[in-house]
């Protein structure tokens, strides 16, 4: 449990921003990381919820998270404590809410919610990839840099963001495109993210556009780098086609259309793939995606000529108005192929009567789209000649544009022949003119300029004379011409400028200066000709002005609409036209935007008004037109120019424009729609800081105007004075509604502390004392609420401005704090106000020292605030403020220390959030540190008890940091032991689970401090135990009735009855502390690095050991004494090796056996677990000393166990153990009468054998002989299993270590093992023994011992024989051929003896198993021999089995024959064709045995079996030799006569295998002739067996044996008439087999008839 806690705490420590001695920082989007670290989570939560609900109005799906991520219970969530499943669930919800928040990223409400998700759920860590990708479309937004600053990406593709994260800075689009094109994994990751977003129905336009744009740029980058087009198609096509077909997200689908268009333009698409794509797009058309879809289809069809739409596609396109949309879209996109294919398909698909309507529609369409000559010809070809050709007037333009170039080259297209003559062409123009003139003739005074402008566009396309006819409809054409210039196309503007010039020239006595601002508008046109015509018009105007300096009429002056216009004098007009414009005609002609910088530059002047009359006049003139012109475009242009006009002329400009601003402020929402946002912003930007009051007066008007004014005030704030800033801030915060741009402008405006002080002072929070007044106040409570609201907004504003930079506001804020606390019950939002105030004061007081303490700053106010509220956030912030005050002015908080700590122990310590812990830490560090600095005495043990008492309530993962902080503050060298002692006191009454928790925590706590502190705590705890024992003894000896005593380490008196239990708990903690991980290592490190430090630590350790030993001498309680010894052992383990040996050497000679045993255990553990323990060899004599007649059995065993461990560890120094082996193998060890001591001695000798090796030889004989005698006795003892096991183990090690010297003990060891019933049971020590003997003992010596043990097997039985044969098998496996070659004769002789078991009647009950095992092992032996070596042995075996006993023991020879043929069968089956020829040696004997009627039936059966194996494994035609076949065949077939006594299957198989291996017609005939005789045998069994053999022969040999059929037919016919049912059934089966082999064309019946 402790290790788990440590791991958890380490994890929290690594992730916690509140690290000791480190500036706290917290990831944040809205605040500086330092400020965010001290912010209250509750406050962030409240802010997030408010923003969340505002967002939910626009995105209702967010309400799902109202009870999860934004629920009240989320404040208590700590992801570190959640399990994997719970964290994965939160991750999934975080991803979902991120996708919903992404479209609102630029809104502050979304940032508030994100701030909460970052601070509470760490989305920047847990779902970092989704966090970054969700807001990647806003990569150039300033807040995206904060997104990166918070993020900790985990995926490799996002590691390219590392530099941007470190800075942090925003990303350029080029950076992202570069990363996408460079890293294909990032490309796939981002594409999948976009797809997932679409599938979750969270796609939004910014993401779709960003994805499409970046993908197109990546496509261009890859294409330009000569990537294989097919590879690029593979990367893009699947994702793009998915987007195109995804109808659930229009934005995603439109982005797919854009990408597909790019792919079609960049990569070669197969013509076969375009029709399916077009079909897929048209199937998914909607009113939302129709235009992008048509553009995409158009791009696809540019690469697929002669495409035809089917009927369904045409119907769908028509339903969306594709005809008119194609015309509209063709103005910006090339859609000629689409247009032609669409119209051709449309005309072909319609009936005759519909085609006329379509052609008429085409008439109005084709004139507005450009097609090539070939396309025009193809389009005309689908129209029948007999159609109404006059309806195709629109083709005139096409024919002119397409055919004319070919005429110049002398190439006339066939399309010309479709035109009848020029006369018809001219009729088309007349027709068009007539239609348009008719429309123009219908114009009246009610016709709008916009409609007339449309006619003007048509007239410009047909003929300029028609345009003149249109102008004639106006009595005064000047207004319409000006309207055309301001709103028409380039062609209309040019015609209008021409006509305007004519009008001026015709009316030379009229001053047309009213046209100058409109002409100025045309000078910024992108069209060069327009700008040239405009300059010519100005030149003409100037020339006429020069001719006639005095005009009788100024055009427009009498018009009431122009009453507010300013007019230019002749001189001013000349200045405007010549100096201002014509002087820079070349620049203006080249660049239309030149006006915006040049005119303001020329109008700028610092002259006095009387010397700048022309500049002022022109400025007034332009300003009046900017305010009063009826042409919106002209107004906007003039305002944008005037925005840049500065100097002395600004007063004139603002004087004229101010009424326009007032007019706009009075517009209602409907009327305001007639004014563009661009015009409003341009108008407001014309005002500077001198008009601040005027601008401020319009702040509460229309939202567009108000927003523009706010933005302008931010821009001019550097020129504002403090009163103006105060006035502006007051105006903003006093508004009932607070739109989002108010927040932005207040964030951007700089507010000095004097302004804040006046703002705070302007709010009066005073409760009326007069009841009548108070009653009226309640009736009119909104006044009081308004003050609270303004105060809240002021404080929120101050919070965003970094309150630490306003230290002078601390005093007024404390006064406000006092007022809020006093009126807490009367203010609804008092908690929120208190949090704001406390947080601001904490930042201010913590930022700078307090030189003079204001009377308003009182600690009792804060203490009362802390104790009077249940709100944890207020309590935490108040404590932080107390901490800051303690640091800045410690004397101010001195008298409030104990109430604060009492409060903390009962409430704050139980909270489980980072902010509360931060509060506690700050309070402890600052308050206690301040008291220490003041030198005040206070009861630190009482302070410690506050925290110890609160231990169960403190969250587990928060405890370590808190207690470390307390101890570091008050002094860990003194009070670490006090904490441990007080925890020990708490364990007395705690539950077992709580005791374990305290144990684990104490261990973790102690490990976190230095080695010196740990040793000091052990020393002080030991001294406490000894002191308490002495106090207890003194109270008992005095005889006084004392039940309680006072100890300095505890804040309360201790009951004498529990004092002993308390010491036991303290001793447990001492042991626990001493066993802490790496304690000894840390000590050794200090010893290496600092000798002086180690001397002090060593002294402390000696002191602790001395105290514990003294305690063990004085204590009389056995349980307490046991804990003393445990603690003593733990402390001793901390000693370095040299000191360890000194101390333990004394303890090993102590008179107390218990203490010696403890010392032996300590030594053993140190040797096993320690490092660099060579110095411990000095203790070998001391350990050996404990193996003596004076020691009890337990001590002797422990000493030998310890000696064994030391022998293993110090095996490199065997000379040290020569003396101990003599003691161990002597009367106190091996020869001890106690069985347990013997076992320990044997185990110790086993280990010493490995260490000493040959050095043990002087003692070997004595040890082994005595051990074998012990082994023999143990075998007979029912409880001697452990001793038996130990002896065998020791012998195994002897055989391993000294194989040459221990060979003489192999035979008795084998005999003992074979005789043991337990050796081969569960532990299998016997098998291990035999494996060791087989592996290590030389073959020659081993075989000798085995042969000598064989007679013992005859006595012990078959089980022993089988185990010995297994040992031989192991020996044969581990022996080389050469080793076997030296003893093979003796081995063969042994096997002959073992093979004779059947004759000698050994193992009668299990002789078959023994014989089989012997044969198998013998075959292993044979495999080790060469053929040359084995053949003589085989002949010897043959003569031994079949000849040696022929005369001396006729009955015994049968047993050997039985063995021999059993062996021969296994031998042939094992070695197969390699040894088939060995049968030549036994063929005659085999024939003789088979021929003899006296042969044993079992032998006869085994002989037949051997023949089967011999026949089956013949691959060299051994049995084809006539001499062998002639011998064996008759004898083998004669065995049929022994049918009842034989295994029929073996005989049948032998005869069939012989026929198969000796296949020839002569052999078949010979065998068949002999077999046929038995078909007529009087013995039914013989006849049946012969029939079975014939059946098997026909079945096995088939057609080969059919050759004997004619010879067999008479016999078969007789058999078919046999009276015996069995014979008849067998014959029927034979006939069936013969018929099967004869086939369909023949039958046995043919031979029988």
UniProtKB/Swiss-Prot annotation:
PROSITE patterns: HEAT_REPEAT (PS50077). One of its GO terms (molecular function) is snoRNA binding. HEAT repeats lie at residues 1608-1646. Involved in nucleolar processing of pre-18S ribosomal RNA. Required for optimal pre-ribosomal RNA transcription by RNA polymerase I together with a subset of U3 proteins required for transcription (t-UTPs). Involved in ribosome biosynthesis. It holds the Pfam family U3snoRNP10. It comes from Schizosaccharomyces pombe (strain 972 / ATCC 24843). Keywords: Nucleus, Ribonucleoprotein, Ribosome biogenesis, rRNA processing, Transcription. It comes from the Eukaryota. This is U3 small nucleolar RNA-associated protein 10. The gene is utp10. It is found in: Nucleus, Nucleolus. Its main location: nucleus. Component of the ribosomal small subunit (SSU) processome.
């Amino acid at each position: 449990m402790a290790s788990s806690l440590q791991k958890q705490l380490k994890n929290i420590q690594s992730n916690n921003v509140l690290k000791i001695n480190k500036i706290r920082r917290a990831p944040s989007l809205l605040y500086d990381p330092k400020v965010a670290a001290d912010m209250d989570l509750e406050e962030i939560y409240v802010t997030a919820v408010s923003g969340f609900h505002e967002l939910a109005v626009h995105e209702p799906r967010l309400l799902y998270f109202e009870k999860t991520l934004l629920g009240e219970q989320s404040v208590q969530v700590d992801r570190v404590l959640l399990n994997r499943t719970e964290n994965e669930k939160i991750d999934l919800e975080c991803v979902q809410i991120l996708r919903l928040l992404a479209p609102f990223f630029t809104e502050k409400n979304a940032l508030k919610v994100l701030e909460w998700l970052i601070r509470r759920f760490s989305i920047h860590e847990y779902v970092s990839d989704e966090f970054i990708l969700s807001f990647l479309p806003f990569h150039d937004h300033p807040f995206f840099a904060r997104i990166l600053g918070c993020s900790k990406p985990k995926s490799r593709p996002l590691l390219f963001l590392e530099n941007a994260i470190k800075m942090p800075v925003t990303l350029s689009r080029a950076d992202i495109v570069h990363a996408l094109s460079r890293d294909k994994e990032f490309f796939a990751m981002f594409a999948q993210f976009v797809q997932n977003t679409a599938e979750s129905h969270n796609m939004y336009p910014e993401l779709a556009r960003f994805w499409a744009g970046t993908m197109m740029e990546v496509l261009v980058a890859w294409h330009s780098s000569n990537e294989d087009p097919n590879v690029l198609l593979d990367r893009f096509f699947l994702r793009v086609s998915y987007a195109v077909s995804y109808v659930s997200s229009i934005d995603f689908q439109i982005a797919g259309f854009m990408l597909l268009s790019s792919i079609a333009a960049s990569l070669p698409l197969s013509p076969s793939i375009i029709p399916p794509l077009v079909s897929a797009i048209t199937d998914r058309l909607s009113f939302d995606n129709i235009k992008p879809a048509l553009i995409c289809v158009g791009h696809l069809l540019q690469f697929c000529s002669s495409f035809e739409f089917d009927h369904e596609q045409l119907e769908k396109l028509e339903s969306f108005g594709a005809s008119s949309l194609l015309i509209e879209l063709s103005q910006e996109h090339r859609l000629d192929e689409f247009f032609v294919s669409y119209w051709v398909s449309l005309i072909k698909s319609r009936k005759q009567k519909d085609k006329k309507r379509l052609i008429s529609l085409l008439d109005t369409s084709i004139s507005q789209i450009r097609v090539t000559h070939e396309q025009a010809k193809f389009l005309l070809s689908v129209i029948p000649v007999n159609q109404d050709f006059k309806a195709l007037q629109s083709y005139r333009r096409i024919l002119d544009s397409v055919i004319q170039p070919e005429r110049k080259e002398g190439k006339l297209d066939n399309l010309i022949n479709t035109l009848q003559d020029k006369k018809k062409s001219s009729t088309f123009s007349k027709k068009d003119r007539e239609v348009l003139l008719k429309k123009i003739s219908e114009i009246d005074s009610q016709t709008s300029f916009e409609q007339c402008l449309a006619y003007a566009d048509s007239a410009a396309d047909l003929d300029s004379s028609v345009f003149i006819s249109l102008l004639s409809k106006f009595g005064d054409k000047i207004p319409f011409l000006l309207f055309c210039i301001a709103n028409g196309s380039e062609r209309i503007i040019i015609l209008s400028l021409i006509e305007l010039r004519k009008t001026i020239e015709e009316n030379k006595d009229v001053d047309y200066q009213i046209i100058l601002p409109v002409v100025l508008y045309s000078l910024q046109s992108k069209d060069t000709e327009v700008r040239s015509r405009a300059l010519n018009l100005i030149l003409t105007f100037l020339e006429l002005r020069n001719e006639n300096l005095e005009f009788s009429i100024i055009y427009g002056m009498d018009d009431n609409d122009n009453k507010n216009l300013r007019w230019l004098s002749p001189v001013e007009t000349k200045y405007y036209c010549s100096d201002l414009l014509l002087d820079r005609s070349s620049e203006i002609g080249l660049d239309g935007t030149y006006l915006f910088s040049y005119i303001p530059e020329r109008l700028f002047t610092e002259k006095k008004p009387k010397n700048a009359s022309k500049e002022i006049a022109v400025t007034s003139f332009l300003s009046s037109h900017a305010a009063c012109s009826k042409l919106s475009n002209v107004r906007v242009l003039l305002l944008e120019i005037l925005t840049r006009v500065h100097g002395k002329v600004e007063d004139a400009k603002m004087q004229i424009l101010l009424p326009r601003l007032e007019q706009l402020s009075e517009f209602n929402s409907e009327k305001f729609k007639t004014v563009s946002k661009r015009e409003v912003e341009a108008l407001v930007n014309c005002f500077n800081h001198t008009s601040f009051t005027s601008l401020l007066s319009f702040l509460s008007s229309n939202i567009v105007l108000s927003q523009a004014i706010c933005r302008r005030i931010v821009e001019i704030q550097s020129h504002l004075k403090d009163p103006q800033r105060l006035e502006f801030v007051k105006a903003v915060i006093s508004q009932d509604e607070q739109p989002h741009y108010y927040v932005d402008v207040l964030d951007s405006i700089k507010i000095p502390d004097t302004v804040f002080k006046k703002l705070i002072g302007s709010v009066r929070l005073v409760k009326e004392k007069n009841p009548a007044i108070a009653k009226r106040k309640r009736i009119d409570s909104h006044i009081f609420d308004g003050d609270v609201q303004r105060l809240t907004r002021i404080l929120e504003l101050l919070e965003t401005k970094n309150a630490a930079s306003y230290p002078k506001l601390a005093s007024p804020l404390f006064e406000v704090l006092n007022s809020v606390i006093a009126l807490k019950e009367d203010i609804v939002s008092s908690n929120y106000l208190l949090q704001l105030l406390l947080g601001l004061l904490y930042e201010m007081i913590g930022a700078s020292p307090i030189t003079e303490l204001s009377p308003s700053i009182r600690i009792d106010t804060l203490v009362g605030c802390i104790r009077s509220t249940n709100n944890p956030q207020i309590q935490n912030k108040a404590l932080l403020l107390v901490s800051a005050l303690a640091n800045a002015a410690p004397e101010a908080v001195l008298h409030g220390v104990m109430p604060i700590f009492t409060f903390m122990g009962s409430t704050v310590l139980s909270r489980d959030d980072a902010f509360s812990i931060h509060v506690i830490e700050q309070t402890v560090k600052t308050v206690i540190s301040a008291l220490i600095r003041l030198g005040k005495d206070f009861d630190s043990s009482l302070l410690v008890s506050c925290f110890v008492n609160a231990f169960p309530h403190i969250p587990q993962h928060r405890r370590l940091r808190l207690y470390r902080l307390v101890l570091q503050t008050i002094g860990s060298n003194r009070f670490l032991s006090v904490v441990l002692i007080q925890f020990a006191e708490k364990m007395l009454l705690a539950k077992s689970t709580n005791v374990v928790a305290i144990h684990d925590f104490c261990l973790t706590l102690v490990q976190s401090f230095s080695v010196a502190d740990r040793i000091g705590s052990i020393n002080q705890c030991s001294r406490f135990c000894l002191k308490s024992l002495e106090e207890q003894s003194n109270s008992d000896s005095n005889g006084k009735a004392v039940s309680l005593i006072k100890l300095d380490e505890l804040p309360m008196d201790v009951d004498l009855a529990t004092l002993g239990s308390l010491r036991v708990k303290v001793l447990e903690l001492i042991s626990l502390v001493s066993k802490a991980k790496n304690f000894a290592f840390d000590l050794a490190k200090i010893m290496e690095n600092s000798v002086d430090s180690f001397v002090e630590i060593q002294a402390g350790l000696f002191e602790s050991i001395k105290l514990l030993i003294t305690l063990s001498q004085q204590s009389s309680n056995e349980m307490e004494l046991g804990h003393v010894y445990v603690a003593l052992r733990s402390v001793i383990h901390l000693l370095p090796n040299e000191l360890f040996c000194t101390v333990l050497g004394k303890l090993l000679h102590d008179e107390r056996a218990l203490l010696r045993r403890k010392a032996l255990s300590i030594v053993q553990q140190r040797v096993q677990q320690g490092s660099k323990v060579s110095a411990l060899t000095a203790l070998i004599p001391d350990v050996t000393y404990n193996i003596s007649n004076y020691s009890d059995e337990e001590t002797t065993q422990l000493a030998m166990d310890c000696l064994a461990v030391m022998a293993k560890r110090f095996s490199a120094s065997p000379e040290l153990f020569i003396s101990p082996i003599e003691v161990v193998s002597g009367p106190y060890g091996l020869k001890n009468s106690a069985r347990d001591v013997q076992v320990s001695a044997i185990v110790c000798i086993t280990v010493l054998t490995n260490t000493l090796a040959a050095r043990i030889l002087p003692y070997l004989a004595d040890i082994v002989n005595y051990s074998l005698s012990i082994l023999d006795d143990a075998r007979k003892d029912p409880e001697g299993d452990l001793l038996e096991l130990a002896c065998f183990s020791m012998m195994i090690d002897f055989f391993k270590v000294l194989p040459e010297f221990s060979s003489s003990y192999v035979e008795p060891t084998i005999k003992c093992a074979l005789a043991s019933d337990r050796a081969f049971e569960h532990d299998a020590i016997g098998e291990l023994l035999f494996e060791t003997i087989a592996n290590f003992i030389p073959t020659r010596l081993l075989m000798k011992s085995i042969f000598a043990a064989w007679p013992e097997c005859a006595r012990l039985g078959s089980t022993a024989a089988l185990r010995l044969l297994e040992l031989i098998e192991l020996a044969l496996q581990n022996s080389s051929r050469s080793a076997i070659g030296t003893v093979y004769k003796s081995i063969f002789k042994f096997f002959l003896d073992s093979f004779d078991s059947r004759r000698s009647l050994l193992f009668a009950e299990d002789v078959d198993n023994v014989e089989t095992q012997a044969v198998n092992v013998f075959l292993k032996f044979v495999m080790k021999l060469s053929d040359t070596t084995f053949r003589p042995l085989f002949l010897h075996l043959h003569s031994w089995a079949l000849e040696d006993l022929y005369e001396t023991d006729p009955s015994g020879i049968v047993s050997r024959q039985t063995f021999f043929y059993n062996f021969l069968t296994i031998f042939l089956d094992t070695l197969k064709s390699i040894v088939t020829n060995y049968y030549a040696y036994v063929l005659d004997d085999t024939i003789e045995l088979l021929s003899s009627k006296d042969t044993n039936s079992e032998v006869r059966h085994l002989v037949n079996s051997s023949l089967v194996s011999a026949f089956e494994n013949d691959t060299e035609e051994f049995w084809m030799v006539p001499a062998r076949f002639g011998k064996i065949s008759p004898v083998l077939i004669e065995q049929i006569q022994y049918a009842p006594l034989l295994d029929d299957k073996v005989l049948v198989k032998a005869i069939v295998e012989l026929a198969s291996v000796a296949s020839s017609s002569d052999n078949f005939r010979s065998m068949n002739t002999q077999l046929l005789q038995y078909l007529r045998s009087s013995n039914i069994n013989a006849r049946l067996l012969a029939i079975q053999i014939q059946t098997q022969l026909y079945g096995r040999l088939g057609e080969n044996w059919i050759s004997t059929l004619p010879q067999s037919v008479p016999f078969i016919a007789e058999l078919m008439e046999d009276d015996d049912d069995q014979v008849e059934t067998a014959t029927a089966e034979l006939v069936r087999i013969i018929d099967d082999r004869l086939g369909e064309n023949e039958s046995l019946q043919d031979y029988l008839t």
